[in-house]
Amino acid sequence: MNGFSIIIPAHNEASVIESTLRSIIASKLDRALQIIVVANGCSDDTAARARAVAGPILVIETPIGSKPHALNVGDRVARYFPRAYVDADIQLSDNALQKVVDAFKDPNCRIAAPTPRHDYTGHNPLLGGYYRLWRSLPYVRGAIMGSGFYAIDAELRSRFTEFPALTADDKFVRNLTRPEERRVVEGCHAVINMPETFGDLLRVKTRWTYGNLELASARPDLNVNDQDRYRGVPTHLLMRPWLWPHVPAFVFIYLYTRNAARKKIAQQQNTTWERDDSSRTISRETRPAA
């Protein structure tokens, strides 16, 4: 039987997990749906809240607070391909599941994700300006990563045995593919609430950068080179003078987080589950996907 498995690693996500699950279940799909929530290292009632949502949901609890471990636990019981790995704090448009599944009708597609929609409604003007500049960049608009949702087929899953103990699981999987095997699916979206304070933004961006540096060090064979994506940024910005006022904030955040991430690498500090909590303080029910 055709189906679609979704694995959600969730660490202390009680404030958002119900809304995320309802968003997934409300998204139309022409096949069986299997949702696996792996509540890992939780000290709240994430698991109980996930079980309270009606639908084809299996909740697994593990005392180990690790996203890679949670992904591997979910993988062991997942039944279907395509198979998606989804953050616990996103909202999907009601056609996202079907659109992503349909992308795999192309025999060359190995990984697909809905178009990310970054929500920074109500943020202070300085942060809002930074986000407008950042999301205008070509490497952000066309990235598989960044939507909190990526789906893969069985052939791509066969290219690795299990998720390694690395922060950037999405980039690890993406870099096992060639560019022509990747699809950012238009006509559907996943909403990501952006950090609401500079402190949270710096922490999240440091974690992202740390994950990229960690992956480049651990898997040099994957040819991870984040510097390449910045080469066209000066020209991009030069042609968009309305973004110039936000360049100082962009440069500061880039330099600060890269330096902080390098220090963490040098000190071998683990940043697993360091995240933005500012966007989780208000129920996601108040932030519809469409």
Predicted regions and their residues:
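Short, well-formed alpha-helical segments that are part of the catalytic scaffolds
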Residues: 12-26
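Acidic helix N-cap motif at the loop->helix transition within catalytic regions
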Residues: 15-19, 43-52, 95
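A conserved acidic beta->alpha catalytic loop
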Residues: 23, 39-47, 64
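Glycine-rich, basic loop-to-helix element that forms the pyrophosphate-binding segment
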Residues: 61-78
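Short aromatic/hydrophobic "clamp" motif used to bind/position activated sugar donors
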Residues: 83
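Conserved donor NDP-sugar-binding/catalytic core segment of glycosyltransferases
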Residues: 94-125
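Catalytic donor/gating beta->alpha subdomain of glycosyltransferases that bind UDP-sugars
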Residues: 104, 118-121, 126-127, 165-226
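Terminal low-complexity segments of carbohydrate-biosynthetic enzymes
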Residues: 194-195, 203-290
